[in-house]
Amino acid sequence: MDPVQQKIKQQVESNPIVLYMKGSPDFPQCGFSMRVSQALKACGQPFTHVNVLEDADIREGIKVYGNWPTIPQLYVKGQLVGGCDITMDLYESGDLQKMLQEAVGG
């Protein structure tokens, strides 16, 4: 596994909830990242974010790691949940809140 993939694997496995996004939750740099980060904040569980705009290797590497072509990408307990559409569907159904609560042991 190359160093970028190893770094991503470490990030995903050492944090229960990780959002790979453009920008930060307070200053998102794209509408899709903004929507997902707002949904996560509304769920009330702490989450880690990685700003892919700060590291081109991570920005391209996360697409390979998750076999998912777009950003944002949400990982919960080491597994890719999906991008904006899937995350928003889960949020609107109430399933995201349950998933995140279980991930942090609540």
Language-model segments: which ranges?
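Short secondary-structure boundary/capping segments
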Residues: 9-10, 88
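N-terminal organelle transit peptides
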Residues: 1-4
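Thiol/disulfide oxidoreductase modules built on the thioredoxin-like
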Residues: 64-70
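Acidic beta-strand-to-loop metal/phosphate-binding motif
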Residues: 20, 73-77
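Thiol-based oxidoreductase modules, predominantly thioredoxin-like and allied folds used
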Residues: 45-60
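Local sequence-structure signature of Cys/Sec-based thiol-disulfide redox active-site neighborhoods
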Residues: 10-46
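Non-catalytic, surface beta->alpha helical segment in thiol-disulfide oxidoreductase systems
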Residues: 76-105
